[in-house]
């Protein structure tokens, strides 16, 4: 419904909601009736938005802008594409509301031509309902760059023709939080592409780090800053790699994190100290945002300071006023294999031995440690007195967490991670076929792997499929191999 709310705008949305309640208050209304009320109240046909419920896959939105200074005309071409899926080989164009602003060289949003009866505005919603369309803005002073999908106006993957300098400009000057974050993500992905290509110098990486270093010293919202300082998630990046080399992708992402940490340098420790002293344990949004930044600073600081930062993290673990902070400190120590990690792990196990939900987190943290020898650690943890294959939550925390969130260990080049999950599936299937089937879904993307790992994982799947399995597990295996 956020799609429709974004398409209509606040005033039209309220008008439509008033009409909806006038018609259906107290009734079990359908989505069709809801859209009909909103649309008819505003003279707009919203029924095409039902296609979002019926069509699988995430649309890709490609944007290309062009400015004609002679005619003072800015043209924005939008194109959408949704990749075919086995259940729907032919995808239709969806209605995609795209909130747009054009920023001037000083960062101001340029005034856009007003429609009849409307006040002047600095952004607008363009609806792309066809595979491709060009939108023309007349009488526009020279724009520096277009800001797209403001307010996350549609759940799509955005691809633009913005250069690294354009993205850095948006990151510095855009007032919309989502557009700012999207610019940071695109710039990070561009830097990562350069690292993966083995380029001796990656200008995008320098621009990304320099821009974030400048923002780090401003009074930007802490919650937003924490997100800007976080590169795209590994699993998200993996979806765009074909073939996928998990080790290379993980190493490239580590390069981004390490380079950013060195660029921020001593400022990380100083900001962490400041945030820690001002932390009062509040539950409001601002307090949660400060804690998010506090934890992000600690993770980056631990990468470059091998003496003071681990001691601070160990102290934070002991004195943490919340589970969020305790887990962040422990996770940071584990990720960097700090000497203090072992003692903290032992303390956590003792402290929460009787708390099953919290102990799940203890298993999950260890399963996610980004080291090749985590395969052996996970195998050993299966023998822990508090681990049981009969406990679905414990299996999910340790084994599913390992396979889904630890690319370095799970995709180890010798196939040990695959064999670990293969054996676990055999054991679990005899006890709980539903849990086994859920765990098996972590193996389904084997075709996208580079040849060596693809062959190893396929062999594991074939051995499982050849054995006697439950209907639930067998169905997942057949679909994965079919």
Predicted regions, residues:
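Amphipathic alpha-helical substructures
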Residues: 1-74, 194-214, 435, 449-458, ...
